[in-house]
Regions:
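Single conserved hydrophobic/aromatic residue that forms the stacking wall/gate
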Residues: 1-12
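Short, solvent-exposed micro-motifs at the edges of structured domains
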Residues: 13-265
Length: 265
């Protein structure tokens, strides 16, 4: 942290925060049997392993237990954030009572698990991944690109018994991250909507897998899919790759709050 005061209520702050996971937790469902096969969905042939579901072993026999989730340790994770802040407090003159504050923070946080669930099975089920049992590093749910915060307050002292305060706060930020996943069970682990999707670069990569659905032909289905990819900033930038966990970011949100309070002593 660096704080510098220039006198007369001026303060400049600079902050750098770095953290590194040493013994963080990730979840391994040892009740699953991993086959020697891989899912061919247009991407790398060995990126997504295929599982034989919960309820059968190597020979296809029904197992007595499922959802056996083991908590393991991982050191794959870190975060880095920087904040710059300016403060001005008018202590005399015509603007006495006015306080101004402005800050900008940016950085990123990456880890194996978000830690948003208190139950081990839920933490395993709802983590978007190529392989739900692997130490895959992705953006954490709380990772943000940037946040601008501007605030101003003014207190008018009418007498020694009464004062009115006015406050204004403006924020510009990206409210959340999200993942692009298949609507189904792509890797046979008996969980739905947690398999990160492959973002096709062209029609040839998906023509063996793409079903027409409500469209008249594969070509028409591809035109609709391609148009969706093109209009999305994240998907269009990562063609030919697997989507990252929490890789996509919501558009900037703007929030303005106004407050007025009156104090009587």
């Amino acid at each position: 942290d660096t704080d510098r005061s220039r006198g007369l209520g001026d303060v400049y702050k600079r902050q750098l925060l770095y953290s590194k996971d040493i013994n963080a937790i990730y979840h391994d469902n040892i009740g699953l049997y991993r086959t020697e096969q891989f899912v061919n969905d247009g991407g790398a042939g060995n990126a997504r392993p295929y599982y034989n579901g919960y309820y059968s072993d190597r020979e296809g026999n029904q197992k007595a237990a499922n959802h056996v989730v083991m908590l393991r340790n991982t050191s794959k994770g870190h975060s880095l954030y920087t904040t710059f802040q300016l403060q001005k407090n008018f202590v005399d003159g015509i603007l006495k009572g006015l306080y101004l504050n402005g800050s900008y923070s940016f950085g990123q946080s990456r880890g194996v698990t978000d830690g948003t669930s208190s139950v081990a099975t839920s933490a395993w089920k709802y983590r978007a991944a190529l392989d739900g049992n692997a130490e895959e590093v992705g953006y954490t749910a709380g990772s943000f690109d940037g946040r601008l915060l501007l605030s101003a307050s003014y207190t008018a002292n009418w007498s020694k018994y009464a004062a009115t305060s006015f406050g204004l706060i403006y924020q510009r930020y990206r409210p959340f991250r999200y993942s692009y996943c298949y609507n189904g069970d792509a890797n046979g682990d008996s969980q739905f909507s947690n398999d990160l999707m492959y973002i096709p670069a062209n029609f040839d990569e998906v023509k063996d897998h793409l079903l027409p659905g409500d469209f008249d032909s594969q070509e028409d289905a591809w035109k609709a899919m391609n148009a969706f990819i093109e209009q999305d900033p994240y998907l269009s930038k990562h063609r030919g790759e697997y989507a990252e966990r929490n890789g996509a970011v919501a558009p900037f949100a703007n929030q303005l709050d106004l407050s007025v309070s009156h104090d009587i002593k």
